[in-house]
Amino acid sequence: MANTKRELFLKRRLRVRNKLKASANGRLRLSVHRSSKNISAQLIDDANGVTLAAASTLEKGLGFVGKNNVEASAAVGRAIAERAKAAGIEECFFDRGGFLFHGKIKALADAAREGGLKF
C-alpha cells in the first residue's frame, strides 16, 4: 500500500532530524514551521532548551507583504537573521523538519543567508 502524505512527511522529518543531530556539535538550530497561511522560524539552543530568537508571519509587519507568501517568507528570513545578529548569533544549522526545501522554505533560508546567518 502506498504511503500517505503524512507518513512521508513524518519519515522525512525523522531522517532530517537524525542527520542534524549527528552533525550538531552544540550549534544552534534554526527550526522552521510552515502552514498553508503562515510560516515561523525559531533559533533554538537544544542544550539548554531555550528559544533565543523567533519570527513569524503572525507578527505585525511581517505578514502578507507582497503578491504571495514566498515574499512573506523572505521577510521572516530577514527578520530572524536580524534578530540573530542582535543576539550575537552568526552560525546555526537549518532544520526544515519534514518540509521540502522548495518555495517558502527556500525563500526563508535564502533571505536568512543574505541577512548574515551561516548554515
UniProtKB/Swiss-Prot annotation:
Q: Which GO terms describe its biological process?
A: translation
Query: Which residue ranges does UniProt annotate as crossing the membrane?
Result: none
Q: Which UniProt keywords apply?
A: Ribonucleoprotein, Ribosomal protein, RNA-binding, rRNA-binding
Gene Ontology cellular component terms for the protein in this record: cytosolic large ribosomal subunit
Q: Is the keyword Ribonucleoprotein assigned to this protein? A: yes
Where does the record locate the signal sequence feature? Answer: none
CDD domains listed in its UniProt record: Ribosomal_L18_L5e
Q: Key word Ribosomal protein present in the record?
A: yes
Molecular function as annotated in GO:
5S rRNA binding; structural constituent of ribosome
In UniProt terms, what function does this protein have? This is one of the proteins that bind and probably mediate the attachment of the 5S RNA into the large ribosomal subunit, where it forms part of the central protuberance.
Q: Which family does it belong to?
A: Belongs to the universal ribosomal protein uL18 family.
Q: What is annotated about its quaternary structure and interactions?
A: Part of the 50S ribosomal subunit; part of the 5S rRNA/L5/L18/L25 subcomplex. Contacts the 5S and 23S rRNAs.
Checking NCBIfam families in the record gives:
L18_bact
Task: State what protein this is by name.
Answer: Large ribosomal subunit protein uL18
Protein species of origin: Cereibacter sphaeroides (strain ATCC 17023 / DSM 158 / JCM 6121 / CCUG 31486 / LMG 2827 / NBRC 12203 / NCIMB 8253 / ATH 2.4.1.) (Rhodobacter sphaeroides)
